[in-house]
From Swiss-Prot:
The lineage of its organism: Bacteria, Pseudomonadati, Pseudomonadota, Gammaproteobacteria, Moraxellales. It comes from Acinetobacter baylyi (strain ATCC 33305 / BD413 / ADP1). The keyword Cell cycle applies. It comes from the Bacteria. This is UDP-N-acetylmuramoylalanine--D-glutamate ligase. One of its GO terms (molecular function) is ATP binding.
């Protein structure tokens, strides 16, 4: 229990994590107020009656009365109302910082531009299967503070750059940045700002896991901090990687020790091999038994909307990667599936487009040229993507997702893969990426 119950805690921004922070601080006996720019913010009816509320705009007066401001991850610290409070010396933190103060339970902290939900869920399952009392959440599923209700012995947290911006000295047991590619530059300004936010995950960390295929994931930490890497090449001693046989068999390995064939994983594609290796390294860091982890890998079916296998129609496999909302995620999906079907002369037909968030789509050129037979373009930034991919492959426009799926089917031949991985946000045509994914599945189900 925290001793001080003095000054006012002001939560800025409701939504899932804001509601969680209000309720947690209230239960702990703090004076709590909340402000949100929306007239009726989501969750306004899920907080205690005696919490002071100020909705319709961020209440500068209220913020300036705070002893501390708890900022929801959806709000940028750069907002003028928040900057005014910072200028007055008022600390601005996030719910993850509140969580760290409130518990001594070891934290496994996971971030990355892509694959963090898959790795967080898979690793949580590994810990559970190994008999740990584990709670999984953060940016995924349940907010961090709600996890304490489970009285866990281990916290597995997926953390976004927005959450890490307001977190210092997380002191994680082990932390990993899975990969780094352009994302959220509209919020962080440039790649450096994004990089700095992500690397806050390593403050006070006890052990580090990093991706040796991506130098931006390797932190500057004291030499005494144990570090272990994963990657898709042959690993050095005590590192995780891939050993390839002459017949094309791929083994996930630790040093020279072969652990499991890639074909034994339920989730396919080289990007998922990297995810599995990251989990094995995290598991070693907290002492999970190898045999148990390998068993979990054989069973884990992946997540909805994340390179999710939908069905096979006329010997063509359809994958829903609607969660691919940035270029890095789509690259991973195209490369992962493209490399897997290449030995059988299979090609990818990819559906791209939506709201591009100012990204550089030319980063897709090399992979599109290598693996993609046709790209079907949808959404408000289709034109921009077409310009970036000119002369790489067949580029076709579609006005609806249904039209895109129909066109994709016309290009596809046996052994090919049709992949929805838009590299864009979805709000121009859909309620969100789950809606886009469900509509894609419905379109595929309607194919004959």
């Amino acid at each position: 229990m925290l001793i001080q119950r003095g000054g006012l805690k002001v939560v800025a921004g409701l939504g899932i994590s804001g509601v969680s922070a209000v309720n947690f601080l209230h239960e702990q006996g703090y004076r709590v107020a909340v402000t949100d720019s929306r007239e009726t913010p989501p969750g306004h009816d899920q907080i205690p009656q005696d919490v002071q509320t100020s909705f319709g705009q961020l209440d500068t007066e209220l913020l300036l009365q705070a002893e501390e401001i708890i900022l929801s991850p959806g709000l940028a610290p750069q907002l003028p109302e928040i900057q005014q409070a910072i200028a007055q010396g008022i600390p601005v933190i996030g719910d993850i910082q509140v969580l760290r103060r409130a518990t001594q339970v070891p934290i496994v902290a996971i971030t990355g531009s892509n694959a963090k939900s898959t790795v967080t869920t898979l690793f949580g399952q590994m810990a559970k299967d190994a008999g740990k009392r584990v709670a999984v959440g953060g940016n995924l599923g349940r907010p961090g503070l709600d996890l304490l209700k489970d009285e866990p012995e281990l916290l597995v947290l997926e953390l976004s750059s927005f959450q890490l911006e307001t977190t210092s000295h997380l002191n994680a047991e082990v932390a990993v940045i899975l990969n780094m590619s352009e994302d959220h530059l509209d919020r962080h300004g440039d790649m450096l700002g994004y990089h700095q936010a992500k690397h806050r995950i390593f403050q006070g960390v006890k052990k580090v896991v990093y991706n040796r295929d991506d130098s931006l994931t390797r932190p500057l930490v004291p030499d005494s901090t144990p570090m272990q890497s994963f990657g898709l090449n042959a690993p050095d001693i005590k590192q995780y990687g891939v050993l390839r046989e002459d017949d094309g068999t791929m083994w996930l390995a630790r040093g020279r020790t072969r652990l499991i064939k890639s074909s034994e994983l339920y989730i396919q594609g080289t990007h998922n091999i990297a995810n599995a290796l990251a989990c094995l390294a995290l598991g070693e860091a907290i002492g999970l038994p190898v045999e148990s982890m390998l068993e979990t890998l054989k069973q884990f079916k992946g997540l909805e909307h994340r390179c999710e296998y939908v069905k096979t129609v006329n010997d063509v496999r359809y994958y829903n990667d609607s969660k691919g909302t940035n270029v890095g995620a789509t690259l991973a999906a195209i490369d992962g599936l493209g490399a897997a079907i290449e030995p059988k002369q299979g090609k990818v037909i990819v559906i791209l487009g939506g709201q591009g968030k100012g990204q550089d789509f030319s980063l897709l050129r090399q992979s599109v040229e290598k693996y993609v037979k046709a790209a079907i373009l949808i959404g408000e930034d289709a034109q921009q993507i077409e310009q970036a991919l000119t002369e790489t492959t067949q580029l076709v426009h579609a006005s609806t997702l249904k039209d895109a799926v129909t066109q994709a089917q016309q290009y596809a031949q046996p052994e090919d893969v049709v992949l929805l991985s838009p590299a864009c946000a979805s709000f121009d045509m859909f309620k969100g990426y789950p809606d886009r994914g469900h509509q894609f599945v419905a379109c595929v189900d309607a194919l004959v």
